Every structure is written in structure tokens, then in C-alpha cells.
């Protein structure tokens, strides 16, 4: 299965008639493995800051998580595994696997819990596969 299929079928899936706004699978180095059409153009330093927060949990809290120029307020996550952010009625979930970052961006009517479930389910599966 291609990485694009994981994005299209597993991240951009339909839940009660709603779906993520955008999603991507990127390498720890910031290289894009696959992304949805609406995924924001991000900078390498934004990915570096996310990776740093996985190594040093809490490092993004003072500045927020930035992706594609959008700032998300960092909310509860799982140190070293998941970072969650909020912006207005939407937000972002980033799950770290051994080789990749699984990123989901949502807006209402999708809920934070639904976004977390979508992103973390794929991330957990990839971890089980050694990725």
C-alpha cells in the first residue's frame, strides 16, 4: 500500500459525513511522504520544532505549534508520542512513529476526539508494523 493510500483512505476517511480538513505523513526530517490536497506548505524549522518537542516535551508550550504559518496553542498530549494543538474551532494532532509524523488538521463539526482517534489509530498501526 502506498503512503498516499494511507492518507486518502485512513486519514481523510469519512466519519458521520465529516472528515479532516487536511492530513499528511512526513518523515522525521520533514520530507513529505504523502499529503492531502489541502495540506499547508510548511517550513523545515516548523517540523524541527515539533521533533524537538517530542524529545523535550513542553518545549512548544510557550511559543505554540506552528505549521504552514498557522499557530496552534499546544494542549494536553502524550509526552514523546502525541502533540495536540487548538486554534479557534479547530486544531491539529501529531502522532510520532519510529520513522514518521502522522498529522491531522480538523475544523468543526469534526471534534478533537475524532481527529485524535483517526491520527492515533494509524500511528499505532504503523508502530506495530515497525514504522
From Swiss-Prot:
GO molecular function: actin monomer binding
GO cellular component: cell cortex; cytoskeleton
InterPro entries xrefs: PFN (IPR048278), PFN_euk (IPR005455), PFN_sf (IPR036140), Profilin_CS (IPR027310)
Entry keyword Signal: no
SMART domains to which the protein is assigned, alphabetical: PROF
PANTHER family per UniProt: PROFILIN, PROFILIN-3
Membership in a protein family: Belongs to the profilin family.
Subcellular localization, as worded in the UniProt entry: Cytoplasm, Cytoskeleton
The species this protein was found in: Hevea brasiliensis
Domain of life of the organism encoding this protein: Eukaryota
Keywords: Actin-binding, Allergen, Cytoplasm, Cytoskeleton
Protein name listed in UniProt: Profilin-5
Assembly mode: Occurs in many kinds of cells as a complex with monomeric actin in a 1:1 ratio.
Function description: Binds to actin and affects the structure of the cytoskeleton. At high concentrations, profilin prevents the polymerization of actin, whereas it enhances it at low concentrations. By binding to PIP2, it inhibits the formation of IP3 and DG.
Pfam family of the protein (one): Profilin
Signal peptide stretch: none
Record-linked Gene3D superfamilies: Dynein light chain 2a, cytoplasmic
UniProt key word NAD: no
Amino acid at each position: 500500500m502506498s503512503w498516499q493510500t494511507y492518507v486518502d483512505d485512513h486519514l481523510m476517511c469519512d466519519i458521520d459525513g465529516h472528515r479532516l480538513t487536511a492530513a499528511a505523513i512526513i518523515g522525521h526530517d520533514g520530507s513529505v511522504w504523502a499529503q492531502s490536497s489541502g495540506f499547508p506548505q510548511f517550513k523545515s524549522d516548523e517540523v524541527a520544532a515539533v521533533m524537538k518537542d517530542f524529545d523535550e516535551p513542553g518545549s512548544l508550550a510557550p511559543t505554540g505549534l506552528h505549521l504552514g504559518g498557522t499557530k496552534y496553542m499546544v494542549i494536553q498530549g502524550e509526552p514523546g508520542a502525541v502533540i495536540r494543538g487548538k486554534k479557534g474551532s479547530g486544531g491539529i494532532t501529531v502522532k510520532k512513529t519510529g520513522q514518521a509524523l502522522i498529522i491531522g488538521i480538523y475544523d468543526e463539526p469534526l471534534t478533537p476526539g475524532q481527529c485524535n482517534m483517526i491520527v492515533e489509530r494509524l500511528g499505532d498501526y504503523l508502530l506495530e508494523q515497525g514504522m
